[in-house]
């Protein structure tokens, strides 16, 4: 995936807008319609990997065009009021355009919740398998920079703050069934925070298996 100034290319560039909503936040999210997590984007043909999906697969397996009337009608029927698909050039994010979590953190939360949670519950852009294998290691990265790959001009992300979790981690990504144990575990041991947010400081290409390097904040380097 290509990492640009506004995050991973294509990430959160599509959203359903509730046509009857006047709240100032018209977007339909899975917190309002949990079944949304079971809709999956698909890209047909030979489009560029960073381009928008061409279709969306419904929970029943039917593939509908992204901007077609059939998809909007189906989602609106489940929601109970009309919606339309909107293309957002820069995306819409909760806190920041990049979210990062380690596999050790996901595993520890699962242990605390007596489950094996799917990492998709946490919706990270970047999942890191740290050689330290320390749960919640990400907390130490705030203020520092992660770079991806060994080249001097490799992609880089400045870690800005910890990720405060919401009810989204409670939904099973395959069934959409809610289970509060994962969120309860995060609240109990980490003050409802797991993973970190970041901002892109250098654009580049991200691929599976890239080595990741951490550079602490300047103040931290002076203390070392």
Language-model features: locations:
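Electropositive, beta-rich accessory/interaction domains or terminal extensions
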Residues: 1-152, 156-171, 205, 211-224
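A conserved acidic, glycine/proline-rich C-terminal tail/linker
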Residues: 166-203
